[in-house]
Amino acid sequence: MTEHVQIKTAKWDSGEMEYFRFGRGKETLVIVPGLSVQSVMRSADAVAQAYKALTDDYTIYVFDRRKDLPAAYSVRDMAEDTASAFRALGLGQVNLFGASQGGMISMEIAVRCPELVKKLVLGSTSACVTEGQFALIEKWIQLAEDGDAAALYSAFGEALYPEALYNAARELLIELAKSVTDEELRRFVVMAKALKGFHITDELAKISCPVLVIGDEDDRVLGAEASREIADRMGGRPGVELYMYDGCGHAAYDTAPDYKERIARFLSGQAALE
């Protein structure tokens, strides 16, 4: 049985950020999650269980966004704060996995703080959020601003998960929505608005560490081409791999049964495409 995971706080001169840690391996794996209605800190035990197979080889850290979110907060701001949290904990040369918005944050860190990143895994993310992609996110923002947590959870889940899985989880999502606070909705709006105009495509060539890009053909949030574009912009250099699932949805990082194994193979130097 997975041991109960404790939530801790990383502190630096200008901010604080919650995180949790599990595993006992010599290597460090840091996970930066995507945009969510409620913090991943609420699901710490479930995350630890999901990554249990990696805990012998890795000590795993999962970071939230900073505690006191300002009204205007860009993805680059998020990356700067996350890097500050790394440094506050003495983390460097980490294996970094970012999913969705977390992938955008991770790309920013890899570009601006290359000394912090040993290997990079990017899941269901994009180097450039287009107006078409942001149109969906804008609908989520409106639901959050209206205070309609049930509709937000429903719309969010429908976009992230394959239809069958969403239909099976619909009642659970409605139940989860009952616990959403006004502050959680405010934070969601700030984080979602940060996606507008995000663009790091022209800087991807600066990333020199090994990179695994994982996408899904049925990604209804950012689209399958977003993952291909990232891999293409890396210049086809050695050390860059692209793997595309089909039918797992945007949240393939949760739904694909071999996702964690694929990450582990890449980090250990094996081909993730096998």
Give each language-model segment a name.
Residues 77-94:
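Conserved acidic catalytic loop of the alpha/beta-hydrolase fold
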Residues 98-102, 106:
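Gly/Ala-rich beta-loop-alpha elbow adjacent to hydrolase catalytic centers
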Residues 131-133, 151-198, 202-203:
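Conserved alpha/beta-hydrolase catalytic His-Asp/Glu region
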Residues 207, 213-215, 219:
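Short beta-strand/loop motif that positions the catalytic acidic residue
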Residues 225-251:
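Catalytic histidine neighborhood in serine/cysteine hydrolases
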Residues 248-260:
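Catalytic histidine-centered segment of alpha/beta-hydrolase-like enzymes
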